[in-house]
């Protein structure tokens, strides 16, 4: 009888431990799923990158006059590894998603400097691609729309190169940036890649880019 009681207790403890482990795993999966839906800093399925997702990322920043949500879909056949973001003005509390495999999309955001300051959010982000080159993306949301407009750009640089002031100047002034005009624009990036991107004209902007094999 005592042996039966001991066996019963052991089985009960094993079942309870298994149930607890399963519950924790399910909770973790639910949290990961929620995070992958529309959170800046997340990597999501490329096919799910939409305007609605970016609007959710943008809304999470709160009531800020100059802000941007960025989504970049990797259909290049390569893996991207984050290098850095260079801000000409503005900032972000989000770390660039470190690794973006083929078929996935990264979500990122930026905002004007905090406080009553007359700045926009302008910067460049850089990703090292597994072929040894660099994907660079420019976003520019000005403070004063009497003088400036929204602009964006995308380029593949040969070799690995971090984002900096020089890269910003090249992409903004010299390499035919696209105006944020509420329309789609296509570009041959070279190296067997092409891009399709959209930016709106608002001070609370979204930038959606798809990088695919040519």
From Swiss-Prot:
Record's signal peptide: 1-19
Region (N-terminal region): 46-65
Pfam families: Anemone_cytotox (PF06369)
Claim: Chaperone is one of the keywords in the record: no
GO-annotated molecular function: channel activity; toxin activity
UniProt motif Cell attachment site, crucial for protein stability: location: 179-181
Complexes and interactors: Octamer or nonamer in membranes. Monomer in the soluble state.
Notes on the domains: Composed of a long N-terminal alpha-helix and a core region rich in beta-sheet structures. Before the pore formation, the alpha-helix binds the lipid membrane, partitions into the lipid-water interface and stabilizes the monomeric molecule on the membrane. Finally, it traverses the bilayer, thus forming the transmembrane pore.
Protein name, per record: Cytolysin tenebrosin-B
Organism (species): Actinia tenebrosa
């Amino acid at each position: 009888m005592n042996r039966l009681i001991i066996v019963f207790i052991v089985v009960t403890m094993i079942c309870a431990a298994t149930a607890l482990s399963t519950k924790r795993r399910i909770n973790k999966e639910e949290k990961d799923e929620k995070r992958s839906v529309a959170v800046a800093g997340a990597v999501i399925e490329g096919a799910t990158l939409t305007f609605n997702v970016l609007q959710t990322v943008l809304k999470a920043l709160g009531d800020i006059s100059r802000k941007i949500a960025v989504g970049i879909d990797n259909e290049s056949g390569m893996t991207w590894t984050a290098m850095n973001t260079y801000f000409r003005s503005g900032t972000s509390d989000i770390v660039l998603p470190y690794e973006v495999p083929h078929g996935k999309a990264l979500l990122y955001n930026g905002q004007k400097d905090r406080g009553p300051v007359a700045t926009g959010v302008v910067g460049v982000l850089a990703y090292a691609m597994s072929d040894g080159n660099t994907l660079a993306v420019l976003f520019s949301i000005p403070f004063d729309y009497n003088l400036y407009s929204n602009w964006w750009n995308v380029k593949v640089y040969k070799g690995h190169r971090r984002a900096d002031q020089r890269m910003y100047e090249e992409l903004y002034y010299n390499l035919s940036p696209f105006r944020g005009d509420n329309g789609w624009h296509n570009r041959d990036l070279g190296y067997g890649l092409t891009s399709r991107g959209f930016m709106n004209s608002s001070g609370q902007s979204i930038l959606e880019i798809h990088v695919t094999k040519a």
